[in-house]
Design a protein with these regions (language model features):
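Alpha/beta enzyme core
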Residues: 3-11, 25-52, 58-75, 83-171
């Protein structure tokens, strides 16, 4: 059963549990992830990142994600992970994804806010939840432990207040 990201995260906060998010590059990956969620009777986020499009095109994967999510009895969010542009987020929404993540972490802070707001306006008009990113999540090497890659708490508060995103990935 397809649910919204916001709804799933609110339930997880109430129940004090985490929700697994899995990038799936094939129908077999999608089926395996959902089967595991069914066996555990657990909610799940199945997601596809823009960097994976060369081997798992959005137009081919979206129908598989959506059908698998509709056919199960566990809550499933179908999510775009690390979308790099307005167009990518719009494409995922047009394909039926109920949640998109805009990754503007490499942008200057003010530009990240501006672009996130643009995407959030479009997504909200379509009833789609939005996640954004601050800091360098998943982009830090072992030798790169500098404090400047971590999310500043005050920036995160300001970012969420100005964008009203449903979720925020922080480093």
């Amino acid at each position: 059963m397809i649910v919204s990201l916001k709804e799933m995260l609110q339930e997880a906060m109430k129940g004090q549990y985490a929700v697994g998010a899995f990038n799936c590059l094939s129908l077999e990956n999608v089926q395996g992830a959902i089967q595991a969620a069914e066996e555990l009777n657990a909610p799940i986020i199945i997601q596809l990142a823009e960097v994976q499009f060369p081997c798992a095109p959005l137009s081919l994967m979206a129908p598989q994600y959506l059908q698998a999510a509709e056919e199960t009895n566990v809550p499933v969010v179908v999510h775009l992970d690390h979308g790099q542009s307005f167009q990518t987020c719009a494409d995922a929404i047009c394909q039926g994804f109920g949640s998109v993540m805009f990754d503007g972490a490499s942008l200057p802070f003010e530009e990240n806010i501006r672009q996130t707001n643009e995407i959030a306006r479009m997504a909200r008009a379509c009833g789609v939840d939005v996640e954004a990113e601050l800091g360098r999540v998943g982009d830090v090497g072992v030798d790169d432990a500098s404090k400047d890659v971590f999310t500043d708490v005050q920036e995160a508060i300001r970012f969420v207040n100005e964008t009203q995103v449903d979720a925020l990935a922080v480093a």
